[in-house]
Curated annotation (Swiss-Prot):
Site features described as Interaction with substrate tRNA, chain residue numbers: 110, 131
The organism's taxonomic lineage, starting at the top: Bacteria, Bacillati, Actinomycetota, Actinomycetes, Kineosporiales
Signal peptide region: none
An example Gene Ontology biological process: tRNA modification
Source superkingdom: Bacteria
Residues binding substrate, per UniProt: 15-20
EC class: transferase
HAMAP family listed in its UniProt record: IPP_trans (MF_00185)
InterPro entries attached to this UniProt entry: Dimethylallyltransferase, IPT, P-loop_NTPase
Gene Ontology MF terms: ATP binding; tRNA dimethylallyltransferase activity
Family note: Belongs to the IPP transferase family.
Subunit composition and interactions: Monomer.
Protein name as it appears in the record: tRNA dimethylallyltransferase
This enzyme's EC code(s): 2.5.1.75
Length: 317
């Protein structure tokens, strides 16, 4: 039997589509049938954070079934998740797994993080003074007014960034000022850094929505509120990215009394359903992704076998 002959496999798709379980099943399958162990490299931005476990549906050590997982629990909640830093760390993890004879499996649904790991792209640098100036403008004017300013300077970028997304608006203005080029010019091109097979898990919309609703209920039952309370004591509110994570932001609002816990749970489910649609739209725009139907009742091992069938093989000597 030929060996899988590809340097990197990515399992992508929306939240609650079953990526994590397929990643574990694929890792076992590779070792059992090909003698080449698979190791997972996380590509979920919020799973980078230590202690953000319940609300991110992070696999427990037992659920990882002995499969090595990289880039989980590498940031404190007070740290900002930066895609450029992730890119360097993910590429280092891929090279490490490969050097030891394994097959790296990039697993996650954070679209830009996946692209940063698999594609040949370079992110513009940042300047703290320029960033601080635009953030001060954001604080005074608000995101909608700053979005109007971006529209004057870079209409193409403004058309792709929601008026309420202050962080991305600031970044687009910063990049434009530093490079003198449109923000879109710095976005990733679809050119692989190394040969890669990307596989997306496609779940019917109604089924995915139901999975998300059930997952949110399980998170609350599993202690999400207590997890957020613990992380609050460790500086969660100071974290620019961690404090905005779905579920965590809503529970913090409940702590503040601006919403009830029931309302926070319902809002988390609604926003997660919306987020899943955005994730799928992102990955659907990439024609290189091979989509596998993954409806309710799909066996992760069966899906892993179908992923394996998509991989090019090298003939045995």
């Amino acid at each position: 039997m030929g060996q899988p002959n590809v340097p990197l496999v990515a399992v992508v798709g929306p939240t609650a589509s079953g990526k994590s379980d397929v990643g574990v099943a694929l890792a076992h399958l590779l070792e059992r049938e090909h003698g080449r162990p698979g190791e997972v490299v996380n590509a979920d931005a919020m799973q980078l954070y230590r202690g953000m476990d319940v609300g991110t549906a992070k696999l427990t050590p037992a659920e990882r079934e002995g499969v090595p997982h990289h880039l989980l629990d590498v940031l404190d909640v007070t740290e900002t998740a930066e895609v450029a830093r992730f890119q360097a760390d993910a590429r280092a993890a891929v090279e490490d797994v490969t050097a030891r004879g394994g097959l790296p499996l990039l697993v996650g649904g954070s679209g830009l993080y996946v692209r940063a790991a698999v594609d040949d792209l370079r992110f513009p640098g940042t300047d703290p003074e320029v960033r601080a100036r635009w953030e001060a403008e954001l604080a005074v004017l608000g995101p909608h007014a700053l979005h109007a300013r971006l529209a004057e300077r870079d209409p193409a970028a403004a058309a792709k960034i929601l008026p309420g997304n202050g962080r991305r608006i600031v970044r687009a203005l910063e990049v434009g000022e530093l490079t003198g080029r449109p923000f879109a010019a710095s976005l990733p091109e679809q050119t692989y850094l190394r040969p890669t097979v990307q596989v997306g898990l496609a779940v019917p919309r109604e089924q995915l929505d139901a999975r998300i609703d059930a997952r949110v209920e399980r998170m609350w039952a599993a202690g999400l509120v207590a997890e957020v309370r613990d992380l609050e004591a460790r500086g969660l509110r100071e974290g620019r990215t961690a404090s905005r994570a779905l579920g965590y932001a809503q529970v913090l609002d409940a702590f503040d009394g601006t919403t009830t816990e029931d309302e926070a749970r319902e809002l988390t489910a609604r926003l997660t359903r919306r987020f899943a649609r955005k994730q799928e739209s992102w990955f659907r725009r990439d024609p290189r992704v091979h989509w596998l139907p993954a409806p309710d009742g799909s066996d992760p091992l069966d899906l892993a076998r179908r992923v394996l069938e998509l991989l090019p093989v090298a003939s045995a000597a």
